[in-house]
UniProtKB/Swiss-Prot annotation:
It comes from Rattus norvegicus (Rat). Pfam families: SHIPPO-rpt (PF07004). This is Ciliary microtubule-associated protein 2. InterPro entries: CIMAP2 (IPR033557), SHIPPO-rpt (IPR010736).
Amino acid sequence: MSTIRKWFKGAPFGVQSHRFDVSAVHPNQKKFSTFTEAPYSRHHSVELSHIGPGTYNSKETCFSKKFLEQKLGAGWARAQEASRLTQLPHFHFQAIKKEREQQANKRGPGSYNIKDFLTELQKKPQSKRGLLSSGETRFRGLIGNYYPGPGNYGEKGNPYTQLEKNSWNRSHSDGLMCRLSSKPPPLSHQGSGLGPGTYTIKSDIETFVEKSTGTRGPYDIFSGERSSPVPYGHYSVQKKKPRELTSFKSFVDELNAPHKKKQGGFSKYPRDPKHPTERIYWTTLSQCPKDVNVAGPGSWLPHETEQKHVNRPPFLLASKRSGLKACQMLLGTWNPVGVGRYLNTTLMEKIDRRQRYRSLFMSEPKRYLHDLNRDKLLQERITPFTKGKCRPTVDYNSDPTP
């Protein structure tokens, strides 16, 4: 079992823990300005407590040869100059940088141009084809039989004319040896049509003299002096342009510009509108107050409450009168007698006890002789089936006839 290396000898009872470990001591019990004030740290107690002469290597300090070579490798002046040059923009983009700085500084009413959505849509790539365009040719020509009829083949409607010409050329052609070469026959000598002394032919010397040549020789590496500034590369210097008269826009031209057409004009909208024009402010009640005449929550009439009969407690007391159930529980009496303990007969006395027979007048059946056809039908239902028939009466109690 590996144990922690100790820097002291003679630990009592073979204990391997450190002697001044105060990490478990409460902070209120630690004394100030002593070792027990700070918790135990291996870095301060073990590693740094034994540093002394001869215990560390001087080659690893900041003045060692290896450290100085690393710091002085490329040169601090050259590194600083290179970092400065990398932050500078290329001279081709310096004009663009100045223009952007002026745009950032020159901000205010009328100093910028806000394009509407129609102008932005025109800048986007568009297609000439519409939504219903399929790209197919509208009229593709004749559909059906593409073969022409008789009399439309060959020269002047005769298809055998070309065949006769080919057979004639084969029979009257050149010999076999003449037809082997693919070169065309030599043309006859034709003149240019110019007379003597009407044109000038330049000699070889005149042609060589008029030939354009450069001023640099074969060993000229640079077309200029060595001390002149470098025209290209990272260390190049921008060439100064010759001073010319520049044309600046006058105040009248800027005022009549198309993006300043509506500036300075009177608006048709009120300066302080009652309701804001932007819909984003319509949700806030303080910025967009509601109209008083418009119906809304709380604009209707409240319901009328009915006045119910309430039996007030006697002698204008604030406490409620105890009910029958409370008297039975507290007093144990089933027939309480006292002020206000009798039955309230006020409601019973006001009941209307008159009897009305309204059902006679609200019945649906009609009176007699209201509808003659219907009354006749009802009379047939109650007519006996023996009406109009005279059957002999038989007395079953008497003797039968012989």
